[in-house]
Structures are given as structure tokens and as C-alpha cells.
């Protein structure tokens, strides 16, 4: 089970797709969409990222920052971001320490095979650093619209 709403979002530091260290606390004062996804350039993850990209102007207008996190490398994030022209930072959690911190790393099943990986989850964090909403078992195609609606932003 991921961390619940109503608690402070744990701070962390990860490298972004420009190889720059980013701390969550650097973004205090802004609403943040912190979304965890399994892997760069895979069908569901691409759909989710591209929907955030397509709605990016609405997020920007509302002052909402999007941060994507996966266990991929910085190099992988660079390729993914360039290929799909993603306008928001992607953070490399190669050792899945932040996934563990937010409790979104766990057992998964695909084509009958069980393995450990990222459980697609999004945290909405307010300007005070509090988790205000958690989306579990995210459906990539509809997710950006759900997030905007949760922030009260028209789509």
C-alpha cells in the first residue's frame, strides 16, 4: 500500500534527466504531481506521459509541477523525454529507494509471471508539502484528466 493522503510527503533527492540533483523540498510553495511509473518507452507509461504532456499548458497555467519517477537511468530518461517531447522533469530512481520510501515498489504479475516492480501510483502534493491525494492502480489513458480534476483545473 502506498503512503496515504494527509501526511507530509517524504523529502528525497534524485538526478533528473539533465543529471541535476532535484529535491522534492525545492518545490515547496507549489502544487506537485509526483507520478511513479514502471519504465520509459513502454506502452502504458508512454500513454501516461504523453497525456501529461498534452495537458501540460493547463498544469503550467495553474502553477502545478509534474515530476515523473521510474527506476530507469538518466540516459534512458533523456531518450524518452526527447522522443516524446516531454516538458517536465523525469527523475532516475535506479535503486528504487524513493519507490520504497513512498511504498510503490512491490509484487506484480504479468503474463502469469510474478516479479517486483513499480506499482503505478500518483501523489498530489500541496504547496505545504502535504500529500493531499493518492491515485493507485492508475489507468494511463484517463489519468491526466483525473489529476487536473482533483486540483480543480478545467480540461
Predicted feature locations:
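Chalcogenol-based redox active-site neighborhoods
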Residues: 1-155
